[in-house]
């Protein structure tokens, strides 16, 4: 069986990614992947946001993760006024 030289890095990357996911999920309910290490630098249009959640208190930085209608997760700074306004609006509705 011949394998393309270009396919080898692809399969290696997939193997590493799957191994990393398995390793983090075996540690219990807390996953560092649920933490925000950087915040978005732009304001997300409110109509694109479907839901949000707060990051775990064990994370090194606090964060609010907004889930967009397309299913993307965006880390935001909970002290930004627009983030607080969006949360307030979502709680009221």
Curated annotation (Swiss-Prot):
SMART domains: SCY (SM00199)
Entry keyword annotation includes Thylakoid: no
InterPro entries xref list: Chemokine_b/g/d, Chemokine_CC_CS, Chemokine_IL8-like_dom, Interleukin_8-like_sf
Protein name: C-C motif chemokine 14
GO biological-process terms attached to the record: antimicrobial humoral immune response mediated by antimicrobial peptide; cell chemotaxis; chemokine-mediated signaling pathway; inflammatory response; intracellular calcium ion homeostasis; positive regulation of cell migration; positive regulation of cell population proliferation
Disulfide bonds: 35-59, 36-75
Superkingdom to which the source organism belongs: Eukaryota
GO cellular component terms, semicolon-separated: extracellular space
Annotated glycan sites: 26
Keywords: Cytokine, Disulfide bond, Glycoprotein, Secreted, Signal
Tissue expression: Expressed constitutively in several normal tissues: spleen, liver, skeletal and heart muscle, gut, and bone marrow, present at high concentrations (1-80 nM) in plasma.
Record's comment on post-translational modification: The N-terminal processed forms HCC-1(3-74), HCC-1(4-74) and HCC-1(9-74) are produced in small amounts by proteolytic cleavage after secretion in blood. HCC-1(1-74), but not HCC-1(3-74) and HCC-1(4-74), is partially O-glycosylated; the O-linked glycan consists of one Gal-GalNAc disaccharide, further modified by two N-acetylneuraminic acids.
């Amino acid at each position: 069986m011949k394998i393309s030289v270009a396919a080898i890095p692809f399969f290696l990357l997939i193997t590493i990614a799957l191994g990393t996911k398995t390793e983090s999920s075996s540690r219990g309910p807390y996953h560092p992947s649920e933490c925000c290490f950087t915040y978005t630098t732009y304001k997300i249009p409110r109509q694109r946001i479907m839901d949000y959640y707060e990051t775990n208190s064990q994370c090194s930085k606090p964060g609010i993760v907004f889930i967009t209608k397309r299913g993307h997760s965006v880390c935001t700074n909970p002290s930004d006024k627009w983030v607080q306004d969006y949360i307030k609006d979502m709680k009221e509705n």
